[in-house]
Amino acid sequence: VQRGSFRHYLLYYCADYLVGTHVQPCAPDLMVHYHLAAKGIRARGKQVFLQHGVIKDEMQWLHRENLYLDLFVCGAKPEYEYIRDTYGFAPEVPRYLGLARWDNLLRAGQAPCKKMILFMPTWRGAHYPDGEAFRGTQFYQSCQALLNSPRLHKMLEQYDHTLVFYPHIEMQKHLAQFHTESARVYLADSKTHDVQQLLLDCALLITDYSSVFFDVAYLEKPELYYQFDEAEFRQYHYKQGYFDYRRDGFGPVCTTEDALLRALEQTLQNGMQMPPEYKARTAAFFPLRDTQNCARIYEAICGL
């Protein structure tokens, strides 16, 4: 069905169920139908929001006052409790069922990892400095310093690992401004690399705030949080929600390059294993960790 066609509109308004990974699932025009639905003008079908990641920050636009849903699928227990208690939906709307896409992630995640470290920082919002001004940001300077760190390069050689730098897709327009002097460090983008495959292949994840860390934790791989610009990040990005990285995170929080490299070396020395403390947090955060998420979601939709 061609998006935005008459047939698309016809099917959209006649469907019994509208199921998708984003709000206003299956809508011919997401933003138009989002605003129409907020005013009570919406399709007759049951609205099912599968989600494509775990919510951790405050997202006012997903509250009931701005969004109608019949089923709000949650991927983690604390996320479900946060949405249930603060987003204003009827008690039966949010359900902890697990993310549908994680069934395949868990199956594929049984394969051995590569000796690869994935460095994946997230974006900084639509109003972050652009062009030449980008080089003056803490994001650029911290990431560039790490990519060219002799200490990192020596570590990669010593432990026979590579590092793949894959910034958020909204930051990849700046990728040409980064450079490295090590043959073991790769600058990657969405044209040449698949995110899901990178997450499966990596032995360890370094990120700042990217929610991909939930995927890596779900696979019980070690991760490090390199939060070099916390105050600046909150200025341009979402406000913090229920998730506290130091209390709830699945790896240590590092605010300096030195602390990050010390934590990285310790993890390399330990054979790239997730420490027991963080495995326990993972188990508490994802009590449903099997390959039955799709089945649970299907049953929930049938019960609407």
Spell out what each predicted region is.
Residues 8, 152, 194-195:
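Acidic, amphipathic alpha-helical patches
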Residues 3-4, 169-214:
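Donor nucleotide-activated moiety binding/catalytic core segment of transferases
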Residues 30-52, 136-145, 221-232:
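A short, gly/pro- and small-residue-rich
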Residues 289-304:
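C-terminal alpha-helical cap of glycosyltransferases
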Residues 91, 177-182, 211-285:
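Catalytic binding pocket for nucleotide-activated donors in carbohydrate/polymer assembly enzymes
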